[in-house]
Swiss-Prot record:
Sites where the protein binds [4Fe-4S] cluster 2: C171, C175, C178
EC number(s) per entry: 2.8.4.3
Provenance organism: Leptospira biflexa serovar Patoc (strain Patoc 1 / ATCC 23582 / Paris)
Protein name: tRNA-2-methylthio-N(6)-dimethylallyladenosine synthase
Assembly, per entry: Monomer.
Domain TRAM: 388-458
Name of the gene: miaB
Lineage: Bacteria, Pseudomonadati, Spirochaetota, Spirochaetia, Leptospirales
Keywords for the protein's UniProt record, in alphabetical order: 4Fe-4S, Cytoplasm, Iron, Iron-sulfur, Metal-binding, S-adenosyl-L-methionine, Transferase, tRNA processing
């Protein structure tokens, strides 16, 4: 006798339409977008895979911020040619900012490529794949949207106890060096209730810390909600242990955001605050909307309210027209602020940007390289000094994983974003699951420019 089928059961098994492989380049937003793509295909009965050789569809989710990002993708596409020869039905697509930036020009590069889709068009991907399987060639869709936020998809981009949650997309600032407004469109924000629902689901999966993402995260605006109101709602309506955010713009940093960071223990006291340059003239040419003095005043205000704040930054050297004196101004700002860490780059001209149209890339490459070396050396020295000053102090650490160098060492971050490594004490559990996600106190005993090392306080 056959058992009775319930309403949720079906006589026909789900047919898998193929295996999808997604490779991600660039920022945390791209990591989140790759999660959106996987979720879209899962809903359409595709399987996702981490093995490129067994895939039926390969997507490269790309970045367009720097020139070497393009070179990486060209090289990667060429390396995938052998799979296309083995399986002519394999579909290879380029997604993301490079797809949006270069569009159909990618089809003229003699690459094994079937599909080009920009960040605002991912909902169409399953349909576009079907069109390709029906014989359509060189499929491209790169329309920008003023409304798409993928609100209901909630891809759950989880790394252990941490997760990213995109709260807004796009950028309205049009910094002259930046391609993002042209590849991701204008700013639009997700509904607060959708964001909070996603965080609650992440909590149920064991996530302890979420990082709120946006190209200009603190310019979040949805009806009556600004960024502070959103964070307050998250802290009130969830029990998530830590809330971080990246990347803010200095022009959108009101006093009540600083007060909220000082007041709320669960709101991480760490800020990634892009400087980009230390000269007001260069900042004006970059269209950054603040002067050197305004940036320094903001940092001084933040540090006065939150003395142990962790501040990191982005800095570009060799922007068109940057003189030696203007570069020295950048070094002076770095010395005054004493960033915990910085991402430092040589200026590279990007197709489609205002700087490409308006300025001549006139700083010689050897000068850019020398300035970058000087800046990196200064930042490394400051990072070491700051970390060395923490020796003898005790920090509350949220354990994330084992350290890269040893399975007998655990690592995690302090409330201010500092990476701390410490050994598992003898006689205590060596089972990683007993440690991950726990908050412990660690006494700092050693320091490098990147890491604090210590021992567990039992």
């Amino acid at each position: 006798m056959n058992p009775t089928l319930t309403e949720s059961q079906t006589l026909t098994p789900t047919i898998q339409l193929g295996k999808v492989y997604v490779e991600t380049y660039g920022c945390q937003m791209n990591e989140y977008d790759s999660g959106i793509v996987k979720e879209l295909f899962r809903k359409e009965h595709y399987e996702t895979t981490n093995v490129v050789e067994e895939s039926d569809i390969i997507f490269l989710n790309t970045c367009a911020v720097r020139e070497n990002a393009h070179a990486k993708i060209y090289g990667r596409l060429q390396s995938l040619g052998y799979l296309k020869k083995k399986n002519p039905n394999l579909v290879i697509g380029v997604l993301g900012c490079m797809a949006q930036n270069l569009g159909e020009d990618l089809f003229h590069q003699e690459l094994p490529l079937d599909l080009i889709v920009g960040p605002d068009n991912y909902r169409t991907l399953p349909e576009l794949i079907q069109n390709i399987r029906n014989g359509e060639k060189d499929v491209q869709l790169t329309r920008l949207s003023r409304s798409e936020t993928y609100d209901e998809l909630e891809p759950k981009v989880v790394n252990g106890i941490q997760a990213f949650v995109t709260i807004m997309r796009g950028c309205n600032n049009f910094c002259t060096f930046c391609v993002v407004p042209y590849t991701r469109g204008r700013e639009r924000s997700r509904e607060p209730k959708s964001i909070i629902h996603e965080i609650k689901q992440l909590q149920e999966m064991g996530v302890k810390q979420v990082t709120l993402l946006g190209q200009n995260v603190n310019s979040y605006s949805y009806e009556s909600y600004d960024f502070c109101a959103l964070v307050e709602s998250i802290l009130k309506e969830t029990t998530i242990e830590r809330v971080r955010f990246t990347s803010p713009h200095p022009k959108d940093f009101p006093d009540h955001l600083i007060s909220l960071m000082a007041k709320e223990d669960r709101f991480s006291s760490q800020i990634h605050m892009p400087l980009q340059a230390g000269s007001s003239k260069v900042l004006r040419d970059m269209k950054r909307s603040y002067t050197k003095e305004e940036y320094l005043d903001l940092v001084k205000k933040i540090q006065s309210v939150i003395p142990d704040i962790g501040i990191t930054s982005d800095i570009i050297v060799g922007f068109p027209g940057e003189t030696e004196e203007e570069f020295l101004e950048t070094l002076e700002v770095v010395k005054k602020v004493k960033f915990d860490m910085s991402y430092m780059f040589k200026y590279s001209e990007r197709e489609g940007t205002i700087a490409k149209r308006k300025f001549i890339d006139d700083v010689p490459e050897e000068v850019k390289s020398r300035r970058l070396i000087e800046l990196v050396e200064l930042q490394t020295k400051i990072s070491l000094e700051k970390n060395t000053s923490k020796i003898g102090k005790i920090f509350s650490i949220l354990i994330e994983n084992t350290s890269k160098k040893s399975k007998q060492e655990l690592c995690g971050r302090s409330h201010c974003g500092r990476m701390v490594v410490f050994p598992i004490p003898e006689g205590m559990s060596q089972d990683l699951s007993d440690w991950i996600g726990k908050t412990v106190n660690v006494l700092i005993e050693q320091a490098t420019s990147a890491t604090l090392k210590g021992k567990l306080i039992v």
